[in-house]
A protein has these predicted regions:
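Conserved glycine-rich cofactor-binding loop
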Residues: 10, 17-19
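Conserved glycine-rich Rossmann-like NAD(P)H-binding loop of the short-chain dehydrogenase/reductase
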Residues: 31-47
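The beta1-alpha1 cofactor-binding region of Rossmann-like NAD(H)/NADP(H)-dependent oxidoreductases
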Residues: 61-71, 103
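Substrate-binding pocket helix/loop in short-chain dehydrogenase/reductase
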Residues: 97-98, 105-107
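Active-site helix of classical SDR
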Residues: 121, 156
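Residue(s) in the substrate-gating loop at a strand-loop-helix junction
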Residues: 140
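SDR active-site lid
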Residues: 173-267
Length: 332
């Protein structure tokens, strides 16, 4: 199964006002695609769409509401005559121990991360059955790993993986010309921690190694053209998953270290975050206190399998960083 070149596609992107979604929208537009941007922040969406001129349109939507997601699809059809790729990026997180997090915060996270993906995927599949195309869901290495102090985030991403795999199998059984890809990023330098609901006594951050959002955007757009079942973004994340599969009990014993790696030294800046109301959108990147990798040689090699030498080098470099506990500060 193959898909149209990117410069002939219309691509719907949820969560397009910040982070991975924004990076994907910009990269897609630069490569000639027309884009339909969806998020909760209207003023930010309007500014982003203005960057791309007639190649972009936007819809203010909360993906936790099915009627809003249907409105995204309807707007894409009305504006561009349909769409070829649907990318579910919208997602939130909550930091803190499970026992201390309010039930309404748990529910809101699941509504966005899981149900937003379910609504988007099913609506997209209905449209694409007749014309072919791609559904790309953004999971996480938390689709394969538990994360203490991000328990419901990991729960939601495990569920996204199960749903995505099932949808793929059902579309294959139908003979539908629709590819379904799960992209699983490691830690990515986005504003996600800054916009999180935070119950901790410190400002949240991400465990190393951290990768730039352009790596995820590139993987997503690769899947829009070249169907691929799963894509890990970040060799460090792949190593963690492999380690957990090899020694799950040993991974459990890392709980205290994993919790510590999610805390900065300063007190919380904005503990309510953007869980229940949009705020802090408009930026691709966050402000992690440690070095951010320039790229992921591992991921680029998996997208281009002939680059085996690059894959080996990337894994070796990432292993050295993870095992050595390198803590160099981010370069300006």
């Amino acid at each position: 199964m193959g898909h149209k070149p990117l410069n002939e596609q219309v691509i719907v992107i949820t969560g397009a006002s910040s982070g991975i979604g924004l990076a994907t929208a910009r990269m897609a537009a630069r490569r000639g695609a027309r884009v339909v941007l969806a998020a909760r922040s209207e003023d930010v969406l309007a500014d982003i769409a203005a960057e791309f001129g007639t190649r972009a349109t936007y819809v203010v939507a909360d993906v936790g509401r099915r009627e809003d997601v249907q409105a995204i699809a309807d707007h894409a059809v009305a504006t561009f005559g349909g769409f070829d790729t649907w990318v579910n990026v919208a997602g939130l997180t909550v930091y803190g121990p499970l026992r201390k997090i309010a039930l309404e915060d748990h529910e809101r996270l699941i509504q966005t991360n899981l149900w937003g993906t379910v609504y988007g995927s099913l609506i997209a599949a209905e449209h694409l059955r007749g014309r072919g195309g791609a559904i790309v869901n953004v999971g996480s290495i938390a689709s394969d790993l538990a994360f203490p102090f991000q328990g419901l985030y990991a729960t939601s991403k495990h569920a996204v993986k199960g749903f995505t795999d099932t949808l793929r199998m059902e579309l294959i059984a139908e003979g539908a010309p629709v590819s379904v890809t799960l992209v699983k990023p490691a830690s990515i330098d986005t504003p996600l921690p800054n916009r999180a609901r935070n119950y901790m006594d410190r400002e949240p951050t991400l465990p190393p190694p951290i990768y730039p959002p352009k790596e995820v955007a590139n993987a997503i757009l690769h899947a829009a053209i070249h169907p691929q079942r799963d894509i890990f973004v970040g060799g460090g994340g792949k190593l963690f998953v492999m380690g957990k599969e090899f020694a799950p009990g040993a991974y459990d014993e890392l709980a205290s270290a994993i919790i510590a790696q999610q805390k900065r030294t300063e007190p919380p800046r904005n503990p309510k975050g953007a869980l229940h109301a949009p705020q802090g959108a408009g930026r691709e990147r966050g402000d992690p206190p440690i070095y951010v990798m320039r790229s992921s040689a591992y991921t680029r090699a998996t997208l281009h399998p002939l680059a085996t030498a690059g894959l080996a080098a990337g894994l070796a470099a990432t292993a050295a960083l993870v095992l050595g506990g390198k803590r160099a500060r981010r370069r300006p």
